[in-house]
């Protein structure tokens, strides 16, 4: 101990020895990608990944979205164990089979679409949701099959169908097998229409490519989350093609609503109540109680 240390009151450091820092668990805080606010992760999850400061809708996993929609303990998953195969033995920088394994390990899911049947405020409902964390929510054979099985389940039990889209489009590693899903999913909705059952499409950020060009825009009612990017090609690709500057907000949900391409915009936190009210109206039933 130096002579200076002896003279200084206790608790005041006189050397450059780093102090012990209280450990903070990783992942406890997250930065809003829009306003930059530091957000407490448990509160953000409770708020359905919507920034409480600026209202920015951040990415949410498919199971969390469906859990927020359905009544508690009412769900049964559809085609839960159905997984993709590399029929074309496709390889770019990596083998497609390797990409599948990596995506499954990172997400804990078999593929990019989760489908369930359950209850929404006591009424039967079938719903599916894309998981963008799985290969950008790309649509391959499994996504198309799960979507179609969900539509068939809705017909079997006489329930409406809701799909939350979030996708970069068709999965290029499956080639024409992927593109065929555009027709397959659209045909599945035809059966739903013949049965007189409603289909509500909820477009979230981003919904592009083959998904936006097929079932995502075929809802009896098309709803979008705020500021969602919706279109076939992205704005940068369009600008490079036409060599013109696009209007501000082009392809965002507010722009599409203004030009009649979608029916309404709904905050994610209000989506459950909004869907329950719309489905009651379409089914000519009394509005459900707020819950």
Swiss-Prot record:
Per UniProt, the cofactor note for this protein states: Binds 1 zinc ion per subunit.
Q: Which HAMAP family match?
A: AcetylCoA_CT_beta
Q: Return the Pfam families for the record.
A: Carboxyl_trans, Zn_ribbon_ACC
Q: Where is this region: Disordered?
A: 1-23
Q: What is this protein called?
A: Acetyl-coenzyme A carboxylase carboxyl transferase subunit beta
Locations listed in the record: Cytoplasm
- BP-aspect Gene Ontology terms: fatty acid biosynthetic process; malonyl-CoA biosynthetic process
In this chain, the C4-type zinc fingers fall at 32-54
Q: Which family does it belong to?
A: Belongs to the AccD/PCCB family.
A GO CC term assigned to this protein in UniProt: acetate CoA-transferase complex
EC code(s) of this entry: 2.1.3.15
The entry's Zn(2+)-binding residues are 32, 35, 51, 54
- Molecular functions (GO terms): acetyl-CoA carboxylase activity; ATP binding; carboxyl- or carbamoyltransferase activity; zinc ion binding
Pathway(s) where this gene product acts: Lipid metabolism; malonyl-CoA biosynthesis; malonyl-CoA from acetyl-CoA: step 1/1
According to its UniProt record, this protein's enzyme class is transferase
Organism (species):
Stenotrophomonas maltophilia (strain R551-3)
Domain CoA carboxyltransferase N-terminal, by residue range, is 28-291
Quaternary structure, from the entry: Acetyl-CoA carboxylase is a heterohexamer composed of biotin carboxyl carrier protein (AccB), biotin carboxylase (AccC) and two subunits each of ACCase subunit alpha (AccA) and ACCase subunit beta (AccD).
Q: Which domain of life is it from?
A: Bacteria
Q: What does this protein do?
A: Component of the acetyl coenzyme A carboxylase (ACC) complex. Biotin carboxylase (BC) catalyzes the carboxylation of biotin on its carrier protein (BCCP) and then the CO(2) group is transferred by the transcarboxylase to acetyl-CoA to form malonyl-CoA.
Q: Which UniProt keywords apply?
A: ATP-binding, Cytoplasm, Fatty acid biosynthesis, Fatty acid metabolism, Lipid biosynthesis, Lipid metabolism, Metal-binding, Nucleotide-binding, Transferase, Zinc, Zinc-finger
Q: Which cofactor does it need?
A: Zn(2+)
Q: Principal place where this protein is found?
A: cytoplasm
């Amino acid at each position: 101990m130096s002579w200076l240390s002896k003279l200084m009151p206790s608790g005041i450091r006189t050397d450059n020895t780093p102090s012990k820092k209280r450990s903070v668990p990783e992942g406890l805080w997250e930065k809003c990608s829009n306003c930059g606010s530091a957000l407490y992760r448990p509160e953000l999850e409770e708020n359905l990944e919507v920034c409480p400061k600026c209202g920015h809708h951040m990415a949410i996993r498919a199971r969390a979205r469906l859990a927020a929609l359905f009544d508690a303990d009412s769900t049964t998953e559809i085609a839960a164990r159905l997984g993709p195969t590399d029929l074309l033995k496709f390889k770019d920088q990596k083998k497609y089979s390797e990409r599948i394994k990596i995506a499954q390990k990172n997400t804990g899911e078999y593929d990019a679409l989760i489908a369930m049947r359950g209850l929404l405020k006591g009424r039967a409902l079938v719903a599916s949701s894309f998981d963008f964390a799985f290969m950008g929510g790309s649509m391959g054979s499994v996504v198309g099959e799960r979507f179609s099985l969900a539509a068939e389940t809705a017909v079997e039990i006489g329930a409406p169908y809701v799909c939350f889209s979030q996708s970069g489009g068709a999965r290029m590693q499956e080639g024409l097998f992927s593109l065929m899903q555009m027709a397959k999913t659209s045909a599945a909705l035809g059966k739903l229409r013949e049965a007189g059952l409603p289909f509500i499409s909820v477009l979230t950020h981003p919904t592009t490519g083959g998904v936006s060009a097929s079932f995502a825009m075929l809802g009896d009612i098309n709803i979008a989350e705020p500021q969602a990017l919706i279109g076939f090609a992205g704005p940068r690709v369009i600008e490079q093609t036409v060599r013109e500057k696009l209007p501000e907000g082009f392809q965002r949900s507010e722009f599409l609503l203004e030009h009649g391409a979608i029916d309404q915009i709904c905050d994610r936190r209000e989506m459950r109540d909004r869907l329950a009210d719309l489905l009651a109206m379409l089914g000519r039933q009394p509005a459900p109680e707020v819950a």
